[in-house]
């Protein structure tokens, strides 16, 4: 039955790229109601949230919303459009560029899924101002790692850097609702950084390139810091003071390098 309180005239499917509710029929869940979804047949907007609390880090669910928006447009009767609901939006610019192109079509009533291979090639060229096969390959790796929803479904937003966490031997997160789980292959992201650097002389005058390069390098450093923290914990537990001291120095140097990369990012 309908709640006794006033029913909203429209809804935001707030985190639809990860946990869509527009097609929820279980009344025990947000948006769900017996006998029908779409918030009891109320106009609603498919939203991308992505960022919680301004957390830094490369993270997104590209394939989810590229497919999800098209599927919703074909199946839903009350979808009113798309929107973004991030708690901060100063990182991962590719997400927003792509998100708003998902409904850019000659026939709005017949949306088609974007060809991501073609889209990424065009994106790299227009963002960096030149063709670059290595930069495109780097983007493919980002799509397969940090922007792959199969690897980024933990709690809220991007994996947090252990550098931001309270010091400890076992670090699971830097904040209450965060996580520090990096479940993609970290070596692949290092390869993406190498590929971006391959055409540095060709692309260095592009502000977009410099921004993306700094963000990728910062994420690589964050991932590396996580590995050193684990080694430090192991050295501490084994009582190897010399090894712990050596690893600590390297860990601190990673923090300095990450600070340098953050300083280079022109937001």
Question: Locations of the language-model features?
Answer:
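Solvent-exposed, amphipathic alpha-helical segments
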Residues: 98-101, 141, 145, 227-238
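Histidine-centered catalytic/metal-binding microenvironments
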Residues: 175-267
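Catalytic-core regions of glycoside hydrolase
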Residues: 1-138, 148, 152, 156, ...
